[in-house]
Every structure is written in structure tokens, then in C-alpha cells.
């Protein structure tokens, strides 16, 4: 085989291997997982994601005065249906988009608990974008840089391995078949 042909084959083999190398070194394959983070709880205490290691976790930035606030009801339905199988949901109230979460913890609890019957854990109000974002959201922005929250009710599904398994933008309702399919896939996954 000629030197030119050998160099060409080496170049082609390298080009074919590059995508798999890129996947192996992609941000989603970082050593840090979601289980490294915790949120202050809206009603006190901490919500430690490490306590749910090995289970899927849906982390959703929420707001009480948003056109999407009725998604609380869908999140509660999802929680009711799959919590006993291991699904964890964490709502993270945020005032980052349209100043639609200006209230106090009592105001937030009234909206979530009284108006929508929410029983899944809610974090204390936190920033989800920018340099003051909660560490979980900074990590998620590295894991999935083009799928960061652009509005309220952005959903990150954390897989059993602690990495982001799926991302659902605001417009996708919690009971949408795509969300349910992704949740069930993670629940059925054997580690």
C-alpha cells in the first residue's frame, strides 16, 4: 500500500472515530452528576438529590403568575402516577422570567398547594440562569448547553445515572406522551 493511500485511510479512520470520541468527551459525560446538588426547601430543610440516587428526577423551574402555571396540575398528575415507582419531582420557583414569581414562600405555597394540590417537594426560590444561577442549573447548562431554560416550567429529567436523560421545554406539558415515555424508560431501566 502506498504512503499516500495509508495516510488517506488514517485520515478517514480518524474522521469516522471523531464523533464517537466527541460523544465520550461531551459535557453530558462529566463525572459530576445531579446527585451532587441540593436545594433549600421552600418549607425548610434541604432537598438533597443524592437521596434519590438511582431514581429518575424531574427538576422543573416554576412560577406562580405565569401562563404556564397550570402545568403544576400536570406535574402533580405525573407525581401521583409514578412516585410509588420511584419518580422524584422537584419544583424550583424562580423569578427569572417575566418576574412571574415575585411572592414570598407563603405565596408560592398557596399557589402550588392550595390552587393546584401539589404534594411533590418545592425548593426555595432560586435563580436558574446567569452568573447567579443555582449550582444545579449551572451544571445543567454545561451538560446540555443548548437546552437551558428559556422560560418557566422548563423540565430536566435526570436519569438513574445522575445525568440529564431528557429535556422538555416549557411548551411540552408534563403529561405529554414524550415526557411519560422518557420517565417510564428511566423507571424501567436497570442499573
Predicted region positions:
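Thiol-/selenol-based redox modules, centered on thioredoxin-like
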Residues: 138, 142-191
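N-terminal secretory signal peptides and thylakoid transit peptides that target proteins
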Residues: 1-15
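Short active-site neighborhood of thiol/selenol oxidoreductases, capturing the structured segment around
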Residues: 51-67, 89-90
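Conserved helix-turn-beta segment immediately C-terminal to the redox Cys motif
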Residues: 56, 70-92, 113-116
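Conserved redox-active cysteine motifs that mediate thiol-disulfide chemistry
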Residues: 61-74, 100
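N-terminal "domain-start" segment that seeds a small globular fold
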Residues: 25-50
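Short, internal strand/loop/helix patches
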Residues: 106-152
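Thiol-based oxidoreductase modules, predominantly thioredoxin-like and allied folds used
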Residues: 87-103, 120-130
